[in-house]
């Protein structure tokens, strides 16, 4: 039997909600998953016992996502709807399109506080970029899948073989576990998947992109920067480019992640808060731990840093360069490229300077290449780890160029391209697909981290920078400003709750204060109120009849001064007007 069939997860089930238990029955299966609603004991038992003979299914589900404890009770999470994405190496890939949150024992205990937690839980599950497959391990690259199969052949089940860094419902799946439950546990990957059947030179092949976001140090743009004490970095993302052709598979992996030392850039109502190093932290230790893990996972690392060489970003760049030098690890090479300076005035052709610098190592690293029968041709021996300040816009541009160069080499080796032919010149149709997919990848990764689509995607989609693209970037930048200052605190709480970083205390709202309770000082209400009144009075004064010019002028000067004073106060105490995470607040306030 195909090992993927042995590890497959049930894809079509009936859910029965009985007074004492949840019963999940796979259609066509010979076993049941029984979850006690009172004792929370989980077991898998034969379907022949007649347990559901007299029951009517409550609903049909397409996946068991896990269970989570909130204030009033535990909740069962199930997938109810899915969207077809494509077929990858013979296995169907889906996107989560609907879910249900079902209480074990409904009650009204701490109802208000519990509803707040349910709202946070839904906010993460409502993300439209969760992907899954019942037979294909989306969490592992092709190369890791082979390594896992060889090093742990006795392990069965998609979740058990999965790369836990990329299992977004790993915490809620681990909350209930029992023997023989593997076929009921459906891992979710957050990121982006695109599967395309394409043709070049009359040869048909599948070209796919899989992007996986890490659960380690997961969060939002300005609340999650740099590294933690274990060397886990913010916005760490692995992207794999897969080619399937004529019984052969190739995979090319790249990574991105925040600069691996302790720094932050907390919102304060300024358009661009200054990023700063966190004082008193061991930056070298964090950087060393990070690259030790990256080398273990990927082999040699080329750290491609695209931040500015001047200003606040320049200070971070100098720190990163110094730390890599002090590490003295021959398996890590640092490559710095001031993206904005080099490509100013829309000279994006200068990116080829960077690609040329990386070409030798890219040829050395190679790609993973294997035949369907398991015959190994080559492995990828190193990785490009790219970053800019956000690891979004500039990073995606460079990654797409490295992916294109790798794809040219792969297709030449497979015989799809002629010797010396480049993929960007081989087919206008494929080039349009390639650019569109990488631009979509940029947008989705950016939406998950910053809340808006990526910047600079006009270059990725068209191959050149345009004025309309620059205008769209301006709109997205303004939207990022609003979300990062006034919405991302709750989004960060939602992520921390779903990933199990925060565990709900049953006494919250009673003996223990609820962390979700709003706490604001007097300035939070006073300055905006004064500003609102001052603006209103200023506008009213402007409508007065012209014969009262002197009096009008005095009124306008007074209310104009009040506008200036209140606006200055808001900016000066900007951190007090930001929506901060409440489960793990990065700072605290003390009103005088």
From Swiss-Prot:
Topological domains, Cytoplasmic: 1-523, 574-592
Side Lumenal, residues: 545-552
Statement: the UniProt record of this protein carries the keyword Zinc: no
Transmembrane feature ranges: 524-544, 553-573
Enzyme Commission numbers on file: 3.1.3.64
Keyword Cell inner membrane: no
Pfam families: Syja_N (PF02383)
GO BP annotations, alphabetical order: axo-dendritic transport; axon midline choice point recognition; cytoplasmic microtubule organization; dorsal closure, amnioserosa morphology change; lumen formation, open tracheal system; negative regulation of JNK cascade; negative regulation of smoothened signaling pathway; phosphatidylinositol dephosphorylation
Domain of life the protein comes from: Eukaryota
Major location (coarse): endoplasmic reticulum
GO cellular component: axon; endomembrane system; endoplasmic reticulum; endoplasmic reticulum membrane; Golgi membrane; neuronal cell body; sensory dendrite
Membrane topology: Multi-pass membrane protein
Catalytic reactions on record: a 1,2-diacyl-sn-glycero-3-phospho-(1D-myo-inositol-3-phosphate) + H2O = a 1,2-diacyl-sn-glycero-3-phospho-(1D-myo-inositol) + phosphate; a 1,2-diacyl-sn-glycero-3-phospho-(1D-myo-inositol 4-phosphate) + H2O = a 1,2-diacyl-sn-glycero-3-phospho-(1D-myo-inositol) + phosphate
Keyword line: Endoplasmic reticulum, Golgi apparatus, Hydrolase, Membrane, Transmembrane, Transmembrane helix
Residues in SAC domain copies: 121-451
Subcellular location: Endoplasmic reticulum membrane; Golgi apparatus membrane
One Gene Ontology term of the molecular function aspect: phosphatidylinositol-3-phosphate phosphatase activity
InterPro entries linked to this entry: SAC_dom
Protein function: Phosphoinositide phosphatase which catalyzes the hydrolysis of phosphatidylinositol 3-phosphate (PtdIns(3)P) and phosphatidylinositol 4-phosphate (PtdIns(4)P). Has low activity towards phosphatidylinositol-3,5-bisphosphate (PtdIns(3,5)P2).
Protein name: Phosphatidylinositol-3-phosphatase SAC1
Biological source species: Drosophila melanogaster
This protein's encoding gene: Sac1
